[in-house]
Design a protein with these regions (language model features):
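Pore-lining transmembrane helices
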Residues: 6-280
Length: 280
């Protein structure tokens, strides 16, 4: 099945559904890394330096603000991968931001909610990009007026409506991991480590899963080691193939940038599983 991409009045490209999916997934993977790397590099440094000057507390809050915009960054990168023009790209980003749930509506205004739900961002991107593709340039001069509503606000609103159901996935995983903590310690650590290893490079937020389960002690250590196991599988797999920047990013724990490769080559799950079992 092919999807036709329009720019102006000219057809510029035909994409398969598969390439459409991976273009969005690549945008998500890179966007997550861009949003999180400043915090990974400087977050703990600023916390330490905040003892000596309040300016570092302020700078640390800027890192948090930057990560809250992850869905916007993801939307822009996905739009670029899909060869959208500038207005289409920012409309896609706006839809992703609304659908992410990064902002909650409260009686007192808006409340920041971290990066939001990445699974829901993915669903919202598919809906918004599909609408933008379908409309193309069919609306002519009305595009600039109607496309933000049809391709941005409405898909974002749909994303908000399905957000509670997306969170059920995280909740179910959290409940499963909570059940693992009731098992024999050896079996528990193996199951938790392998689960975290296999899920690290998916749109599922392990931070959200950890919040649901409130892991501590041996279980928390197994989860952390599972994450380390996944990072090192990708790190050593990248040696000699990727550039220094990619290898450095993997070394500091940004394995989510390999999300598209993980889905494109599911065989990667085998070394991840083995490493997770051994380290568990």
């Amino acid at each position: 099945m092919y999807i036709t991409v329009f720019k102006g009045v000219h057809m510029i490209e035909q994409q398969t559904v598969k390439s459409f999916f991976f273009n969005i997934l690549n945008g998500m993977a890179l966007g997550i890394v861009i949003a999180l790397i400043p915090g990974a590099l400087l977050g703990e440094v600023f916390k330490f330096l905040a003892r000596y000057s309040d300016i570092f507390t302020t700078l640390g809050s800027f890192l948090t603000m930057f990560s809250i915009g992850a869905s916007l960054i993801i939307g822009v990168l996905a739009g670029m991968n899909l060869k959208f023009n500038a207005p289409q790209t920012v409309i896609l980003a706006g839809a992703a931001f609304i659908g992410s749930g990064a902002l909650k509506v409260t009686p007192n205004g808006f409340l920041a909610n971290g990066m939001g739900d990445l699974i829901n961002v993915l669903f919202t991107l598919f809906i918004s990009a599909g609408v933008i593709y379908f409309i193309g340039n069919r609306l002519g001069s009305l595009n600039i007026v109607l496309l933000p509503v049809l391709g941005g606000i409405i898909p974002g609103a749909i994303g908000q409506f399905i957000l509670p159901y997306s969170k059920l996935v995280t909740g179910a995983l959290g409940n499963a991991i909570a059940h693992f903590t009731e098992l024999n310690p050896l079996l528990m650590t193996i199951l938790i480590a392998t689960t975290y290893t296999l899920l690290l490079v998916t749109p599922i937020s392990l931070v959200a899963v950890a919040t649901v389960t409130s892991l501590s002690g041996l279980a928390s250590g197994a989860a952390n080691l599972g994450i380390v196991a996944a990072c090192y599988v990708f790190l050593f797999g990248a040696l000699g193939v990727n550039n220094r920047g990619t290898i450095t990013a993997l070394a500091i724990g940004t394995a989510k940038m390999m999300m598209a490769n993980y889905f494109k080559h599911p065989i990667i799950a085998v070394p991840l599983l083995i490493n997770g079992i051994v380290i568990g």
